[in-house]
Curated annotation (Swiss-Prot):
The keyword Ion transport does not apply. GO terms for molecular function: cysteine-type deubiquitinase activity; metal-dependent deubiquitinase activity. The lineage of its organism: Eukaryota, Fungi, Dikarya, Ascomycota, Taphrinomycotina. The active site is at residues 50, 375. The gene is ubp9. It comes from Schizosaccharomyces pombe (strain 972 / ATCC 24843) (Fission yeast). Residues 553-570 have a biased composition (Basic and acidic residues). This is Probable ubiquitin carboxyl-terminal hydrolase 9. Keywords: Cytoplasm, Hydrolase, Nucleus, Phosphoprotein, Protease, Thiol protease, Ubl conjugation pathway.
Amino acid sequence: MSLLRWMGMNSPGSTDRRKSTWEAELPKPSIRPETLTDRFYGLTNYGNTCYVSSVLVSLYHLKPFRDSLNSYPLPSAPPNFKSVCTKTNHPESSSSRHSKKKSMENRKSSLYGSNGINSCGCVDISNVGSESGTKHQIVVGESNCSAYGMKENIYTCLKDLYCSVSCCDCRYGICSPERFIQVLRRDNEAFRSTQQQDAHEFFNFLLNSVTETLDEYYGNHSDVMHPKWVHSLFEGTLTSETKCLTCENITSRDESFLDLSIDIENHTSVTSCLRSFSASEMLSSKNKFHCDVCKSLQEAEKRMKIKKLPKILSLHLKRFKYNETQEGHDKLFYTIVFTNEMRLFTTTEDAENAERMYYLSSVIVHVGGGPHRGHYVSIVRTKTYGWVLFDDENVTPVNENYLQRFFGDQPGQATAYVLFYTAADEEDDDVSEVDTKESIKPMSIPSQLKQESVEVSNLSSTPRSNSTITYPDMDPMVASFSSQYSHKTLDRDINSRSYFDREPSLDAERFHSRSVDASPKAVRRESRSFFPSLTRKRSKFFGSSQSNSPKDSPLRDTHKSSDEHSESKHSHTLPWQFSRSRSKR
């Protein structure tokens, strides 16, 4: 039996017969059952809310944070998630359904050919197991705050959002955090604007809101022990040591932190930036230190060290610098190298777990030239599929080398902005065994799939890359296909999507509707006004080869007719990637 026939994509009447969920059609991942708790849900963008999505996705995939949020406080009654987790069916007329079906057939024909294989060797099975016109979507609506004994606030909405995804039977789909966005804008004036906001500022606001809500709740319930799990996970202790150069007395002062904001320099690494963070500072002249032993102002040496290491280390790279001339912030496109493993050496002598090893868990990437424009995406390490890119509704597996594109040394405007490192001794056992303790090596494809995999690779026009990394416990189907996945189209897609967030009055859907109605010349004129940097550089995104030919410009790929745009947008669709389709107006 061929691979395509086994998957039900090349057999007669395969589109008409009733199918079970598409997961049943795939080989089971070669991992233990408890690791199947991963959920891969993209979040709907409600107009420049990608800064929210990137933070929520990153925190959700930090298992200690997600589990603590779902567990505290325990509901007095089982929360009613029926109104929260639903499958949405969009009724359509027969003519509209026929038109969309024909358009989809034309699109798949150009993407996958007659055998269902695209040029990258990826099989399109994103709709396997779903009924016609139906995609799994979670709409988080009415709050279950009464079950938690709280008033509706950011914390209860976040708890509803995470619980609805965790409790959902389907592992893949789209989540619409509508109520969370409404309450966020209701309770905080800074986030009511449709302008792009800073993801790090939102992260700090979210942690503070969660902490304040829990303090208030457990303050009113003195009979229940306050777990203080936010501080338990993120809190560390900094020690400011000041050494008098006259008597050599050392004065120490401790302060807590939930994240570290570090200054950056060009052509350095995160470890080097942390060393600079703890570098010595001379206190002299007008900045002399008052020594309690000398009883006078003395020259002194001051430095910051880490006394207590957090379980989850959040690092904020300070890429935005205030420009007094322009009275605004400029982005620093410095090259900052970060690694999957890191150990901090800027600790005090009496520090707890001074030799603690950290592993990279999530990266929030900013695409754009300033803090209030551009786009945010997140890349997280998962137990099942390794590294996964979350770009609003789009969910795509990527290999480990893909992270190197965000060091800041590539053409384009995408750079790592916030890094989340998890301590090795705090990681879940199955995560440690899969992603950290074992070296990443090519997985062995089961014998019954070897011949079929060879056939798929022969059909592909793109040769298999020898540098592609597959994960030892990745789903065999995804491993065999993602190894041939082209990141160039993904890079260009992120680049083009980021510019939809530059102008608050112009969202992606309105842009597409205007592009369809306009003539090609009008579209190009409008493109130059909204994409000035791309028009000047005419370069591929993330370090692709530059071209001087206008026909190779990303603009030629970005602004097409409706059907052509959909083709380019979904040309890199992987088996379980979901994205919201946009309708014409």
